[in-house]
Amino acid sequence: MQDSIEQYMQKVGQQARDASRVLTSASTSLKNHALSAIYTALENNQAAILAANQIDMEKGRSNQLDSALLDRLELTPARFKGMLQGLKDVIVLVDPIGEITDLAYRPTGIQIGKMRVPLGVVGMIYESRPNVTLEAASLAIKSGNAIILRGGSEALESNKAIAEAVKHGLKVAGLPEHSVQVIETSDRGAVGHLITMAEYVDVIVPRGGKSLIERVTNEARIPVIKHLDGNCHVFVEAQADLQKALPITLNAKTHRYGVCNAMETLLVDEKIAEVFLPHIAELYAEKQVELRGCPETRRILGSSVKPATEEDWYTEYLGPILAVKVVSGIDEAIDHINKYGSHHTDAIVTENYTLARQFLARVDSSSVVVNASTRFADGFEYGLGAEIGISTDKIHARGPVGLEGLTSQKWIVLGDGQIRQ
């Protein structure tokens, strides 16, 4: 069986590499034609795709998937509509491929510049979310990359149904149907092959639980664009407008629990804790959010708040649990975030411009937010059209990874017969 998986993955890799050579030189109009055809195919097959998703949901419930995974897995009509809107947004994005920048003459008379080009073949490994299949495929096509998609077994039927619509659109436009391939086996050996096929795959993008990301990071022989988890914070500073702070901290935690940009720790300045905490605690109680607090938080709110442990400060709950800590000021808040956070998304609520700038400069995260919810850390909200993932690394791409994150630059040299003396 291992040999057959290896052969299957080698075939997928070769097909992706061949397709990438065609996509590299595909015009913007041709790529947009393919994306428009995919949009039409998805619209025409919405009922079948949602039915396939229900099969996955039923299997998920039977297999007792936790609520966070089930939430990510589910495709409602509203989420399907959001997927289509994301695809529309990608179509109208400016195509970065072929863009030439920094063109300048050298004393020798040659011109030196940089041209933006596709990465080549992207390998994507993800869990649960079938909408990622379309987001990743659309961004790959628009940026001239082939992509190999390895979704979780729990979303296999949904992913296959979406992939059929994508293939149809590619065929209509005359682009290789293997530009986008979904791995149609649940054999875990497929992941091991995908992350080590350096001859076929140029970059790996894993999206999922911490154990998946750690495995890919440790075993991959290919560059990885990743974030381990989303332990996000909101710091309500002493000069915060509480009419802003209350809805921001409620939204950051309760808008959706099972996402990487949800707040997991609330930090409150000691100068306003006595006033702010009872109000926000009442709102969290209505949403049945369990609070785990520091001693000062428990003194203010009472013993109904569970004592927070050291582990709580590190934890991405992905559920209705929130750690709460009262801090002495901005320095302690920033130190806490940089020590316990995951460098994903962290926010401050304050009316003090100087402190807001200080927070922006000193918090070591891929997205830093002032007076808004952490839930905005998303490619769609950032105007990227969609995102293939979020990176907390500092090399190549950081934060939500959209079209430009799936490209690199090569040097171009333009001469008129010059030789080096």
Swiss-Prot record:
GO biological process, one term: L-proline biosynthetic process
UniProt keyword NADP, yes or no: yes
UniProt keyword annotations, A-Z: Amino-acid biosynthesis, Cytoplasm, NADP, Oxidoreductase, Proline biosynthesis
Entry GO MF terms: glutamate-5-semialdehyde dehydrogenase activity; NADP binding
One Gene Ontology cellular component annotation held by this UniProt entry: cytoplasm
Pathway participation: Amino-acid biosynthesis; L-proline biosynthesis; L-glutamate 5-semialdehyde from L-glutamate: step 2/2
EC number: 1.2.1.41
Coarse class of the protein's main subcellular location: cytoplasm
Family according to the record: Belongs to the gamma-glutamyl phosphate reductase family.
Protein name: Gamma-glutamyl phosphate reductase
